[in-house]
Amino acid sequence: MLSDRQLWHAHNFETIVTATLNAYKAGCSPSSLSEELMELAAAQGFADYMVPGFEHGIGMIGDEWRIGMNDGPIPYWTNPDHIYQENEMVICAMQYACPEEDIGFRYENPILITKDGCEYMSKFPLKIEVIE
C-alpha cells in the first residue's frame, strides 16, 4: 500500500516531467528551462528533490556536436546557454530523488525540438500506476 507521501512524490515527478515536455521548443536554452522548472518545483515544495538538469545528448548525432565545439564555461560539457534549434534532438532526462524516504524516479525520452514544442519519440504515456 502506498502512503500519501509516496503518492505526493509521484505526483510531483509527473508534474515536473509534463511541465518540462511542454516547455521545450526552438529558441529556449537549457539554462532557461532549468530556471523555469526549478521555480515550479520550488513553488510546489519539491525543488530539494530535483537534480537541476533536464537533457543530455543522444550519441553520435543530435546535440553531441556542441560538446566537440564547446564554447561554454565548463570543459567538455554542453554550453548551458546554447539555444535549441528546430529539428534538434536531445534526450529529455530527469531525476528526482528523496534518499531519506527511499524514493526516487528517473525519466528519459528522446525528443525532437520543434518550432512550437517538441515531439516525443517514445509513445508510452507518462502516468502513475499503482500495482497492488
What name fits each language-model region?
Residues 1-132:
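Active-site neighborhoods and metal-handling regions in enzymes and metal-associated proteins
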